[in-house]
Structure formats: C-alpha cells, structure tokens
Amino acid sequence: MYKQSLLSASIVLALSSTSAFADDYALFDEVVVSATRTNQTLINTAASVTVISDKQIEENMAKDVNEIFEYTPGVTMNSSSRQGAQTINIRGMEGKRVKILVDGSSQPGSFDGGPYAFINSSGISIDPDMLKSVEIIKGAASSLHGSDAIGGVVAFETKDPSDFLKDGEDFGGQAKLSYSSEDNSFSEHVALANRFGDLETLVAYTRRDGEELQNFRDSNNLENYAVEDQDTSADNLLVKLQYQLNESHRIEFLAELIKDTSDSDIYHSSYDSYTGADDTEQNRFAIKHIWFADGAIADTVTSKVSYISKEENGVTKRFKPAGPGFPPYVPANNDNLQTKDYEYTEDKLEIETQLDKEINNHYLVYGATYTHSDISNTNMEYNSDTATDDKLYVYTPDAKEQKFGLFVQDEISLMNDKLIVTPGVRFDHFSTDPGKNTGESLTDFSDSAVTGRLGSTYKLTDTGTIFGQISQGFRAPSFDELYYTYDNPGHGYVNDPNPDLKSETSISYELGYRHNTQASSSEIAAYYSDYDDFIETVVTKKVGGTTHYSNVNLDSATIKGVEFSNTLLWDVLVGAPKGISTHFVASYTEGEDGNGNALNSVNPWNAVLGLNYDAPNQNWGTSLKLNYTANKSGSDINFDDESGGNAGQAELPSATVVDLTAYYKPMKDLTIRGGVFNLTNEEYYRWNDIRGDDELYKENSQAERNYGISAKYEF
C-alpha cells in the first residue's frame, strides 16, 4: 500500500525555496502530518497544505513568527507594536478560529483587549531557530483537530536530536549568530545533540535582543499609544530526550522554557510619561510513548501527555501632573502616577491517544483527546494620588475550560492507489465554567458537536492529480467572548458580556489540481466556506457619548477564493544555467456576512514571485523576491460598526516590496547569509495593522530599507 513507500525528499514548494541540483530534480513530495494525522505525501493529501521547512526559514532569514509567513500568501499575522505577534490569519479566519500546535500540543489561547493593548495576550510563543517545519492547513480541520480548527491549523514542529546527528555520528550541533538593522536586533543560538546507545538528547538555546521597529514614523507627529522607544529580549531553551527502549517501545521527553520581555516608552498627549513593561513566561513539558504493537486493533499506539503553564504580565505606568483636564479623575491640585498591573495566566493539561491500523487497502486512525485549562485574567490599578482610589479590574472571570474529543478516519486506497478516499468523523464536547471572582452570577456554557469530512485524491496521469474535500467545522465560543467585560464610560467605551452566544458551525468545499514533473510543480485550488452563527464584535447600542460593544452571533458569513502556486526549474525546462529556478504563488480571498457586508478580517489579494540561483558547487546562491499586496478599499471594507465593521476605516494602498538575499559557504560547515529587505525603501502597511484606524498612521508602517546578516557553523 502507498503508506509503505513514502518518499520524504522535499521539493521546493514554498516560495522562497532555492532550487536543488539537476541530479535531485525528481520532484518528490513532501510528507505532511497535520492534515491527516498520518505521514502522508502532499500529492495524496485532499486539502491545501503549505509546508515551510527549516531550510526555507533560514533562507528567508526569519527572526520571528511574523517573518516565517512573510512569503506565504493567504497567511498573515496580527501583531501589536507593543507586544509583538498575537494571532495568525488564514484566508480571513483568525484568532481562536485557527488552532496553533507545537509538537502536536495545543497552545494557550490569545486574549484580545479591544482598543486597550495593555490587556492583550498572545497565542504564539516560538523561536524560528528551534523549528524543523511549519505545516499550514488552509481550511476547516475540526474533524481531526477539534473546535479551534474551524479556520485551519498551524502546526509547528521543533527540531529533534536526529536532525543534528549526521551519518551515524554520536555528537552534532550548530552555533549561529545574526543581526538585523530592522530593529537593531542581535541573536545567538546553539544546539548540541548526543547519542548514547539507544538514547538521543538535544539541548538548544536562543537569545534575542532588539529595539523598536525602524519604520517610516514621524517622531514629531505621533498618535496616542504609539511606541516611541523599546527594548526587547527573548530566551528560549529546548531540551529533548528520546529513548528507544526496545523494538516495540519508544519514549520521548520534552521541556521548553520561554521568556519574552519588552520595555516600551509610549506616546500619549495627555500624559507626561507613559511606559509599558511586558513579560511572558511559558513552560511546556511533554512525554510521549510510542508502542509498535503490531496487534489486532492497532499497529502503532501513540500516547502523549503535555502540560503548558503561561503567565503574561503587563505593567503600564502613566504620569499626569497636577492640573485640570483629561483624565477627569485626576484632581486639579495633585500629581498622579497611575500603575496598571495586568496579569493573564493559563495552565493547560492535554492528554491524547492515537491508534493506527493498516488493513489491506485501509489505513485507520482513531483516538481520543482531553484538554483541561485554568484561566485567570485580572488588572490592578494603583494611584500615587491618595485622593484617587486603587481599583481591581476583573475583565473576565476565572474560568475552567474542558474539551473532550473522539475521532476516527479511514484512508482507503483504490484502483491501484490511483484513487484515495478519506472519510472522517469526530465528536467534541466543550464546557466553560466561570468562577465567582467578578461578584456576578454567570452561567456555565457547554455544547457538543459531530463534524465530518470526506476528502479524495485521484491520479489522472503520472504527473497530474485532482483533489477535493467537503468538511464541517465547529467552534465553541471562548471564555473571553462569553464573559469579557470592560466598563469605561469616561472614555466612551463599554464592552458587555454575552453568555448566550451559540457555537459557530461551518461547511467548506475545496477543489484543486496538482501537477508535478521533473521541471515544474504547480497547484491550483478553489474554496468556499459557509459559516452559521458567526461570532463577531459589533456595536450594540450608543448611550450619550458611550458606545457599547459585545460579541454576537451573525446569521451567516461566507468566505471564498482561489490560490495558485508554481515552481519552475529552468535548467531542466529549457537548458538554462544549472541552479536557476522561479517560484510564483498568489492568493485571492473575499468574504461577506449574511447582509452582504465585507468581512474586514479578509486580507487583500497577495502574490509573490521568487527568482533563485544556486551555484552548481553549492557554495553560494541568491534569491530576489517581489511581494505584491493589492489595495483594499470601497466595497472590500465594511464601514458599518453595527455589523462588525469600522466606521471611518482607512483604505489600504497597494504595495510591492523587493527583498534580496544571498549566501556563501567559505567552507563545508560554515554558511554566511546576508539580505537587503524593502530594497526600494517603499512605505507600506499591512491590512491587519491598520484595521480600526481612520487614517494611515506612519507609526503603523512596516520597516524601511534594512539589512540582515548571519553566520552558522554546523558540527
């Protein structure tokens, strides 16, 4: 059966990949895991999946999560200038609609404080140098991954000891130094791997230090809450122990410790000083047991227990001298230093068991998952002026979330493996139990759902394959969507809770074609998703000068679009000099609610062209990338704030950004890389960064022309 003959040689399907060499041009497929929970070749996967390898991350000189997806149309980041990466957007679906996995473990959730950045909490903590690959499922994957995967999955996989132990060696590793003028950042990375008989170990550490983004801001004309100066640091420690007990049993241990800090000077016209100190600590521990059972009900049983503890603390200090005016609670005759101490904590326990069984032309995958999360979210306000009371703000109650899932999938190979049909079904139960620390009596929430999926691939010829799928999605509302309360009428903003929210449901359709030859690789896919009870934040009422917001269920929403990618190896195609390749990829998405209003979460269409050259001796190479983003204006924007839009929303101009990178290997194990980014020094913006703004504020622009350099030594 096809499962027993997988070829893991990678082709250059990501846009930044430089070409391989003529002897290696048999364009075999990458192996993906997240889309089917099995090791499946991409060509036999009935879904759009993008794979970004560690090689591509290196070639792009990515130094943070934002830059990992820089050249992946259809995938964008939502970020905060103060706190960095927040959530991932896939085809207009974002936040808790996109499931984030690291080594198969669900990550802590994000928290969106609306207009108040000091109470945001990120859902992503990962360092690019630790990654072996990133898999992106574009579209609903609830039947395999549960509630949070209604909009897709991003699966990060960290490196293993075997990635550094070459040719049977018992010791290996790498050391890397890098610098970027984009934010004046330095990083140091080291990884050490060992083999002691049947035990393999890995210890890897990365340190990063940087400053604020060097963009097109005008320091003399800043808007309130703009970051003026910033110092950042990040520490990431990864430890793995993998022990092959015997032929039947393997056990793996993992520990990851992450600490991110930033200190920001923030501009605000109403304060003499305004600072923010943000610290995130996240610890992840996991143990996995693999049993090669070769039994009647399973060939392999994989069991995993993971625990993640996250604590995010943001301290905001703002000083207002004595005198009348904003804010109104500052007495006229007293100075006041106000300190807001915000804390978000989440402890998540996840247990999962998966059984794999091959029976004739069937490959069965079935199992169960259980997740328990304890979440806390509070803010304490202290005032140096004794006439102003200290206050405790509880934006959401302490909450306990529980998720339980059962899943089964069958990959059926027919017609001598030309046709593969993959039905799957999953049952999910979700519950949220709010605590009593808000002083209010809040109702519990629980819901259950059965979701299904039917996918298929059919090999038309030796080089052409069509694929398609119909998949259902389900997402229960998160604790903050149910209970988030922010009452600040003095600033004209109130967010009301809505514990009566319903779960979102969806049905998605996708149809595509893949074509692989010795000289080219192409894919085109069209997709359509229909959502019911779509959860959106809208204006519910206006009372005097106060606007009330709340999360509500919209009757429906639709998202549709098309994506295309093509890689050409020009030496094989037309006899050009060896090592020349191009890669083109484009993504177009549009979305609207049931009333025909545009979904502002949908990004404008985007296309990237990469021109690559690798010298035949593999000692040097270069890549030129053109990244085009279309404008977003007019009917593509929802200006109605009562249906989830933004009144007065600024329009986004189109932009073309040019990046140039190169590498040189003066010796076998030493690689020096350099790059010039935004080569033409174009002032440009990302749609996600200006959503909600009434004009293009320069402090929200992307980096001006900048350069980066790195040196990596492998041993």
Label each region the model flagged:
Residues 24-164, 184, 511:
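Acidic, small-polar-rich N-terminal luminal/periplasmic segments of exported/outer-membrane proteins
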Residues 224, 363-464, 487:
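Signature of Gram-negative outer-membrane beta-barrel scaffolds
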Residues 213-216, 474, 527-533, 580, ...:
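C-terminal beta-signal and adjacent terminal beta-strands/loops
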Residues 413-421, 430, 521, 526-531, ...:
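Gram-negative outer-membrane beta-barrel transporters
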Residues 110-111, 259-263, 268, 309-311, ...:
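Surface-exposed extracellular loop regions of Gram-negative outer-membrane beta-barrel proteins
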